[in-house]
Amino acid sequence: MSRATALLLVIVIGAVAAFAWTRWTSDEAAVERRLHGLAAEVNESTIDGAGLRARSAQLGTYFTDDVVIDLGKGAAAIRGRATVMDMASRLQPRTSAFTLQLTDIGVVLAPDRLSGSVVLTAEFTRRGGGENAIDARELSLAVTKADGAWRISRLTVVEAFK
């Protein structure tokens, strides 16, 4: 291998490593990792009372105090982290038959890099009964960064074409 080829190889490897490092450590990647963490928490299951309270508290860390969840179709908006946590603790035993996977995540941050918007597809798969059933929904999220963590401040179900 000639010296020029070796130098070119080192430059290419360095550029790829720099790109990968920048991508992994970017705020956009941090938002994506945080959302995948939320999905992993949702997919965990527990059945005892203390475990349900602990899980709902952990799920609450992914939302701002004043989060608004708009499910559309005339449903009343869900307001506040405390409400989300209460609902999560009561629904957990019934949601254990489902898994959540987030795909097609697109993150756009505001110039201040402390807020942004996310569009993604949430795929809910019902396990058991012989055949899995999948329900996919497009979601639009507003996210904010506080105390070093990205949290959801608004979640809206995007209506599909009719």
Language-model features: where?
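Short, well-ordered alpha-helical segments enriched in acidic and aromatic residues
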Residues: 34, 47-72
